[in-house]
Design a protein with these regions (language model features):
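GAF sensory/regulatory domain recognition
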Residues: 39-61
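Short, hydrophobic-rich beta-strand element in sensory/regulatory alpha-beta domains
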Residues: 23-29, 34-43
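Juxtadomain coupling helices with adjacent low-complexity linkers
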Residues: 17, 129-164
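Sensory-domain boundary capping and coupling elements
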Residues: 116-129
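Signal-transmission linkers at sensory-effector interfaces
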Residues: 1-15
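Signal-transducing coupling segments at domain and membrane junctions
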Residues: 90-106
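Regulatory sensory and allosteric helical modules in signal-transduction proteins
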Residues: 58-93
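A short, aliphatic-rich beta-strand micro-motif
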Residues: 109-116
Length: 164
């Protein structure tokens, strides 16, 4: 059986982000499945984000940056502080500028799991699978995992601040 109850003192090493992210990746893959997963940290001003983990770093490289969009996604995730579920390719095409890359990987549904600290968005876990794979219930199965990422995301925000 997969261990899903992480113990902060034993399982998490704040200096080993990649190993920890791989553990979260494995748990999510077991609980709801995925073809692609990335973790992104949002800067303090909510202007851009930076990828700190990817299970496909050839297509979605680590430390890749992008500006935060101004669309329905940013309204729901950044302003209303809610997780985001996109169930099909039609909706993905409306929202994500890199939809062609997403589709080329065989993905057609997306969960963006919001990571909050003190009620402020600090990052997302981005989980992708085939079209119509994810349902609302899947969010509830995995949203507890976001709390384990908070120390890593806060540390990376400090690194991002030094780059500006």
């Amino acid at each position: 059986m997969l261990k899903t109850n992480l113990k902060l003192s034993k399982d998490i090493k704040t200096d080993d982000v990649k190993t920890f992210c791989k553990k979260i990746d494995k748990i999510i893959k077991t609980l709801i499945g995925h073809k692609l997963i990335t973790f992104t940290v949002i800067d303090n001003n909510l202007k851009f984000c930076e990828r700190i983990y990817s299970n496909n770093s050839k297509i979605y490289p680590i430390f890749g940056q992008k500006k935060m969009p101004k669309n329905i996604w940013s309204e729901k995730v950044l302003k209303n502080k809610k997780h985001f579920l996109c169930k099909n390719k039609k909706d993905i095409k409306k929202i994500y500028y890199d939809y062609e890359t997403i589709f080329s990987l065989g993905c057609g549904s997306i969960i963006n799991l919001l990571v909050l600290f003190n009620k402020k968005p600090i990052g997302t876990i981005n989980i992708l699978h085939k079209e119509s794979h994810y349902k609302k219930i899947d969010l509830k199965k995995i949203d507890y995992l976001t709390t384990y990422l908070i120390p890593y995301f806060l540390d990376h925000q400090k690194i991002m601040e030094r780059k500006i």
